[in-house]
Design a protein with these regions (language model features):
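Sec-exported extracytoplasmic/periplasmic mature domains
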Residues: 9-13, 32-39, 80, 102-106, ...
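Extended glycan-interaction surfaces of carbohydrate-active proteins
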Residues: 25-94, 112-119, 123-135, 181-186
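Non-catalytic C-terminal accessory modules of carbohydrate-active enzymes
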Residues: 11, 25, 108-186
Length: 186
């Protein structure tokens, strides 16, 4: 789905409208197939009550519009209540979590996760004396690893608000829209 979105965006920039239409049709079919295969109507989710299982269908557009508010509410409850402001994602889920929450303006949730100092969190790594990012939240494997660096993008695009303008590819136009969150002072 993500690759089809990229192809569609490239086709759009190049003015290849027929290719955009083909991508739209394939995207609609793929999203519907994934939704049908994985959405549990009884539970109102895509598998289990973990953050990546909420974020991926939201980010990929798999969740129909009617389901999106409830999924986002469940994700928020999972972050704030079940996990007490912590992530329960791995390296891939963390990247997509940061990207989607920034894109929908939920920088408050990202900020909450950033400000945790207990396990599992970046703050926990710092509390344990880390000077680099670890491969695993518990510090078991590599202590100089890039797998949890995905949130650095949030510092630029979310917190500082430096964003590309989709209507003007190649940074021909830049959007500056900083997030006002928590106790951050400028």
């Amino acid at each position: 789905i993500q690759q089809l979105e990229i192809l569609k965006n490239i086709a759009s920039v190049l003015g290849k409208n027929e290719e955009v239409e083909r991508c739209d049709a394939r995207l609609a079919a793929a999203r519907a197939a994934v939704h049908t295969a994985f959405f549990d109507k009884g539970a109102g989710n895509y598998g289990i009550d973990e953050q990546a299982y909420y974020i991926m269908p939201l980010l990929a557009g798999v969740a129909p519009e009617a389901e999106r508010p409830a999924l986002l509410q469940k994700l928020e409850k999972n972050i704030l209540e079940k996990n007490k402001g912590h992530l329960d994602t791995g390296m891939f889920g963390t990247y997509f979590m940061m990207e989607h929450l920034r894109a929908i303006g939920r920088n408050d949730l990202v900020f909450t996760m950033f400000n945790q100092t207990t396990y599992p969190s970046w703050g926990h790594m710092l509390e344990q004396g880390a000077t680099t990012l670890w491969e695993a939240w518990n510090g078991f494997w590599s202590h100089i690893h890039s797998c949890f660096t995905s949130p650095d993008n949030w510092f630029y695009q979310g917190l500082a608000g430096i964003q590309t303008d989709p209507a003007a590819p190649g940074f021909k136009n830049t959007i500056i829209k900083p997030a006002i969150v928590g106790d951050v002072t400028w």
